[in-house]
Amino acid sequence: MYFCFDYEIKVFMMEKERITSENITSLKENEIFVFGSNLAGMHGGGAARVAYNKFGAIWGQGVGLQGQSYGIPTMHGGVVRIQPYVDEFIIFAEEHPEMHFLVTRVGCGIAGFKDEEIAPLFKRAMALGNVSLPESFWKCLEA
C-alpha cells in the first residue's frame, strides 16, 4: 500500500511540473510554444497571434515547428480532423526529447472547442516528460 501511495505522489508531482502556464510571455532556449492554428497560417488572433508576435510563427504556415512555436490546425472541422495533427505533434515531441513543448489550450479559444473535447487527443502525451499540458487538460485526462 505504501508503494502505491508513494507512486501516486511521484506521478502527481511530475504532472504539477508539467502544467503549461496560462500566460506565457517568454520561453527558455529549449521551450516550444504549441498553439492552435488554421491551415492557412493566418495567425491573426489568440495564441496564434502570440506565437507570431513573440515566438517565431511564420505567416502562411499553419502546421508544425516554426521558430520556437509549433502549430496544430484546429479551425478546419471537428475533433476527428484535428486528431491527425495532434498525433503528428506527439510523434515530433517523441523524436525531440531535447525540446520541451508547452501545449496551450489548443482549439479551446477562437476555434470554440471544449477542454473535454480536445484533451483526450493528447492522452499519449501524458507519458512524455518533455510535454507540458494545460491544467484543464490534465483534469480531463485524469477524470
Language-model segments: residues:
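Macrodomain-like recognition of ADP-ribose-binding/processing modules
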Residues: Y2-A143
